[in-house]
Amino acid sequence: MACCVALCCSVPTGPATTICSSDKSCRCGVCLPSTCPHTIWQLEPTCCDNCPPPCHIPQPCVPTCFLLNSCHPTPDLLTVNLTTYVQPGCEEPCVPRCC
């Protein structure tokens, strides 16, 4: 997508700090990972014009220990039965796939 090269990029605002913002020039198509302490991959540059996004935006990936950590407030889950299924061949959880 030549129209997206050398244009300014913008990233979704959130708790993470990225090296690319709307006031800096950067290459569109470079996926930026989140820098927050938890494994959440959801930040990605988008072109300022109407070009389609150059990368597939991966789904947020949160470790189970973060979701079920007792130090975080949990909703009313006392009556919910939790069953964990592990898919074979997934030794590396939360690995983002990008372009």
From Swiss-Prot:
Belongs to the KRTAP type 3 family. GO terms for cellular component: cytosol; keratin filament. The keyword rRNA-binding does not apply. It holds the Pfam family Keratin_matx. Sequence repeats lie at residues 3-7, 8-12, 47-51. One of its GO terms (molecular function) is structural molecule activity. This is Keratin-associated protein 3-3. The keyword Cytoplasm does not apply. Keywords: Acetylation, Keratin, Repeat. Interacts with hair keratins. Residues 3-59 are annotated as: 3 X 5 AA repeats of C-C-X(3). The modification N-acetylalanine is found at residue 2. In the hair cortex, hair keratin intermediate filaments are embedded in an interfilamentous matrix, consisting of hair keratin-associated proteins (KRTAP), which are essential for the formation of a rigid and resistant hair shaft through their extensive disulfide bond cross-linking with abundant cysteine residues of hair keratins. The matrix proteins include the high-sulfur and high-glycine-tyrosine keratins. It comes from Mus musculus (Mouse).
